[in-house]
Swiss-Prot record:
Domain of life: Bacteria
EC numbers: 3.2.1.73
Listed result of changing P204L: In strain: C120
Annotated protein name in UniProt: Beta-glucanase
Organism: Bacillus subtilis (strain 168)
Family annotation (Gene3D superfamilies): 2.60.120.200
Family: Belongs to the glycosyl hydrolase 16 family.
Enzyme class: hydrolase
Length: 242
């Protein structure tokens, strides 16, 4: 083989191997399949938000004490009030990030005007990444409905509200989304309810659950009336990597 061709072959091979290594490393950094029945809190797997507020429409401070495990074998997020017109809320998130796959949760949201109970994936500028997010949200003003949404590099406005045919706050049900490169499919108790195919998120995110009260978004959530304590219940979470 002529010298020049041999050099070019080595350069191309090296570039391919470098790209392969980067891809493999990125893949290795995302979490694998798991099932957590919430029989106890795994602090090596999950993190509790504590001591700060998201601000803007979030009218509460995240407190680790507002994330607890109950004797019923469930995780409970609480919305409480330590003082007049001051509110604490609960948020739980995974340590690792997760990519394409099936995300499932068995949960009961809190019921009250002005609040949100959720299950979602998120990554953003504080993580050094674009804002990518996929949501399952319950607006406490009407828990006979569920809202699906997603953000890709900060672009949202993909809300879809689905009538459940039951009150989600009264009993446990399973909610899920299947995130793939060209689509997101949302499910309720195994039944497909909504599909999105445009501008699908690409960045792995942390698995998150939270309960919070809003401010300045009454048209969306309704006005929060100060009722507390309120609780959202999570029986289990499962992720199946695909």
């Amino acid at each position: 083989m002529p010298y020049l061709k041999r050099v070019l072959l080595l350069l191309v091979t090296g570039l391919f191997m470098s790209l392969f290594a980067v891809t493999a490393t990125a893949s290795a950094q995302t979490g694998g399949s798991f099932f957590d029945p919430f029989n106890g809190y795994n602090s090596g797997f999950w993190q509790k938000a504590d001591g700060y507020s998201n601000g803007n429409m979030f009218n509460c401070t995240w407190r680790a004490n507002n994330v607890s495990m109950t004797s019923l074998g469930e995780m409970r997020l609480a919305l409480t009030s330590p003082a007049y017109n001051k509110f604490d809320c609960g948020e739980n998130r995974s340590v690792q990030t997760y990519g394409y796959g099936l995300y499932e949760v068995r949960m009961k949201p809190a019921k009250n005007t002005g609040i949100v109970s959720s299950f979602f994936t998120y990554t953003g500028p504080t993580d050094g990444t674009p804002w990518d997010e996929i949501d399952i949200e319950f607006l406490g003003k009407d828990t006979t409905k569920v809202q699906f949404n997603y953000y890709t590099n900060g672009a949202g406005n993909h809300e879809k509200i689905v009538d459940l045919g039951f009150d989600a706050a009264n009993a446990y049900h399973t909610y899920a989304f299947d995130w793939q490169p060209n689509s997101i499919k949302w499910y309720v108790d195994g039944q497909l309810k909504h599909t999105a195919t445009n501008q699908i998120p690409t960045t792995p995110g942390k698995i998150m659950m939270n309960l919070w009260n809003g401010t300045g978004v009454d048209e969306w959530l309704g006005s929060y009336n100060g009722v507390n304590p309120l609780y959202a219940h999570y029986d289990w979470v499962r992720y199946t990597k695909k």
